[in-house]
Amino acid sequence: MYRVVYTKRAVKDIKNLKSAKLDNKARELIEIVKNNPFQNPPFYEKLVGNLYGAYSRRINIQHRFVYEIIEQPHVYNETDYDGIVKI
């Protein structure tokens, strides 16, 4: 299991997802990524360019969320994690 950390931008975007009624779909995808960031389906894309090293998953045709995986096992609040997923 991976620990999910939200960036400031992601926290702001959550409000937009709620207004577009996409927050439930986004939560489902985040749970999938939390358990296994490389799980298929739903499919993920490796990004290139400025976002090299990051991955994305589609919320719908127009929206997607981008995340970065930091493969570094650690303990947080007495829970063992395989790494961090930064959204």
Predicted regions located by residue number:
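A short, surface-exposed loop/turn module that caps and links secondary-structure elements
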Residues: 31-58
